[in-house]
């Protein structure tokens, strides 16, 4: 059997109106991956004889968005010669940040769309910081709307310089910068003849070269539980995605914070593992599995628990413990002060956490401290804070298990901040 092409998850980021949706639309249109329902609508409208026009498709997608149905960009797939690519989300979605952190899919790469007409705008910066905070290691830059600047090389160079400065400051290296016109279809899938001065890859060629994400099999086993089922003749079956490590039939696993909450080890031997209804002997990172554990009942575990090996159990932070985190405030109506208690979302858990200390305000670009012990932090600020959970929860320092160390903070139906765990302080 030939080795399957690697699967790569990408997100589209960038300032509002710089053409993220159009770029996604063009990728799908030119690779013949337009959503079924749109094609159906086209046929129903008796437009059979006419050629399927890009503008028409974009209007339909726009209508759907305005009716609150974002093209399920939420999971749009297409293929390149060497990759299966899934577009997992595009901002503008209210839950974009939360999805990026708690979504079943962590993004492997981001496409940053910047309009040649505007250059770097506030949201361009914010999304780039966010990509960094969320640990997205690979970025591709698409300078869009080249048709509106007459495909001018000078304009392209000028905007490229701004973007380069921003991304290098954030620690990104080796990122392609591609001049495109999503609307006209230049350099997205088809090479443009309007920019003879450019000889780099098209957007789809750059996507085809995204490095394959390494599977973190060498890290401790962590499986955040999404659901728990009772299956007749099998017993209790927790379901979740292996984030790190390897699970094998016969392993002994323990669940946290369940064990901490019940004051006794909720653990047992793994009797069977299944993926897509097929039994398997071992599960690797990225696998969505159901598994059965001897002696663990339906009421012992729930969504938000995490399975790990007994010799390296998941890290529990209790209400008497605290953890230090670096956050970026994305959207808070006033200011965050000590005592603020919103809800933290990480992997599959949701727990209210209290802001215990505001240690430092950082320059989001350099990470340097600009103010010690600030009185408050507000939208746009990056900060080091100390948080205390209101009930036991599992989270890991991002340096040790990055997949388990990122979180979103939500309140009033929106994502207030995104962050990562620096260290955990256990009370004796």
Swiss-Prot record:
Highest taxon listed in the record's lineage: Archaea
Region (G5): 181-183
Location of the region described as G3 in the Swiss-Prot/TrEMBL record: 89-92
Chain intervals for the UniProt region annotation (G4): 144-147
Region spans: G2: 68-72
InterPro entries: EFTu-like_2 (IPR004161), G_TR_CS (IPR031157), GTP-eEF1A_C (IPR054696), P-loop_NTPase (IPR027417), Small_GTP-bd (IPR005225), T_Tr_GTP-bd_dom (IPR000795), TRAFAC_GTPase_members (IPR050100), Transl_B-barrel_sf (IPR009000)
Domain tr-type G: 5-215
MF terms in GO: GTP binding; GTPase activity; translation elongation factor activity
Chemical reaction(s) catalysed: GTP + H2O = GDP + phosphate + H(+)
Pfam family, one: GTP_EFTU
E.C. number: 3.6.5.3
Keywords, alphabetical: Cytoplasm, Elongation factor, GTP-binding, Hydrolase, Magnesium, Metal-binding, Nucleotide-binding, Protein biosynthesis
Amino acids binding Mg(2+): 21
Residues holding GTP: 14-21, 89-93, 144-147
Cell compartment(s), UniProt: Cytoplasm
Signal peptide start-end: none
NCBIfam families per the UniProt record, alphabetical: EF-1_alpha (TIGR00483), PRK12317.1 (NF008969), small_GTP (TIGR00231)
Role, per record: GTP hydrolase that promotes the GTP-dependent binding of aminoacyl-tRNA to the A-site of ribosomes during protein biosynthesis.
Family: Belongs to the TRAFAC class translation factor GTPase superfamily. Classic translation factor GTPase family. EF-Tu/EF-1A subfamily.
Name under which the protein is recorded: Elongation factor 1-alpha
């Amino acid at each position: 059997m030939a080795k399957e092409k690697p699967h790569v998850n990408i997100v589209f980021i960038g300032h509002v109106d710089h053409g993220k949706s159009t770029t996604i639309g063009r990728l799908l249109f030119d690779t013949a991956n337009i959503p079924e329902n749109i094609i159906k609508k086209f046929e129903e409208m008796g437009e059979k004889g006419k050629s399927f026009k890009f503008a028409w498709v974009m209007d339909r997608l726009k209508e759907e968005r305005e009716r609150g149905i974002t093209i399920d960009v939420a999971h749009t797939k297409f293929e390149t010669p060497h990759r299966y690519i899934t577009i997992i989300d595009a901002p503008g979605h209210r839950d974009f940040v939360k999805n990026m952190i708690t979504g079943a899919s962590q993004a492997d790469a981001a496409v940053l769309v910047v309009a040649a007409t505007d250059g770097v705008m506030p949201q361009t910066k914010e999304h780039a910081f966010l990509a960094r905070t969320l640990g997205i290691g690979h970025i591709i830059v698409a300078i869009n709307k080249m048709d509106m600047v007459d495909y001018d090389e000078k304009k392209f160079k000028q905007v490229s310089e701004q973007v380069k400065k921003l991304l290098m400051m954030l620690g990104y290296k080796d990122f392609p910068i591609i001049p495109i016109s999503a609307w006209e279809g230049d350099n997205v899938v088809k090479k443009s003849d309007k920019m003879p001065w450019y000889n780099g890859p098209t957007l789809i060629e750059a996507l085809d070269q995204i490095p394959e994400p390494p599977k973190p099999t060498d890290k401790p086993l962590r499986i955040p539980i999404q659901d728990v089922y009772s299956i007749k003749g099998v017993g209790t079956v927790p379901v979740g995605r292996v984030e790190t490590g390897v699970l094998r039939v016969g392993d002994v696993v323990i669940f946290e914070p369940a064990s901490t909450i019940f004051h006794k080890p909720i653990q047992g031997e793994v009797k069977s593992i299944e993926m897509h209804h097929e039994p398997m002997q071992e599960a690797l990172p990225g696998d969505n599995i159901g598994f059965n554990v001897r002696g663990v009942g339906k009421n012992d575990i729930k969504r938000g628990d995490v399975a790990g090996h007994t010799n390296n159990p998941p890290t529990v932070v209790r209400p008497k413990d605290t953890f230090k985190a670096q956050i970026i405030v994305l959207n808070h109506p006033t200011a965050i002060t000590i005592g603020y208690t919103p809800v933290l979302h990480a992997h599959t858990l949701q727990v209210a956490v209290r802001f215990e200390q505001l240690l430092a305000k950082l320059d989001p670009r350099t990470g340097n401290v600009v103010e010690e012990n600030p009185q408050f932090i507000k939208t746009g600020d990056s900060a080091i804070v100390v948080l205390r959970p209101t009930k036991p929860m599992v989270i890991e320092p991002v340096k040790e298990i990055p997949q388990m160390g990122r979180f979103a903070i939500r309140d009033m139906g929106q994502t207030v901040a995104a962050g990562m765990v620096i260290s955990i302080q256990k009370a004796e």
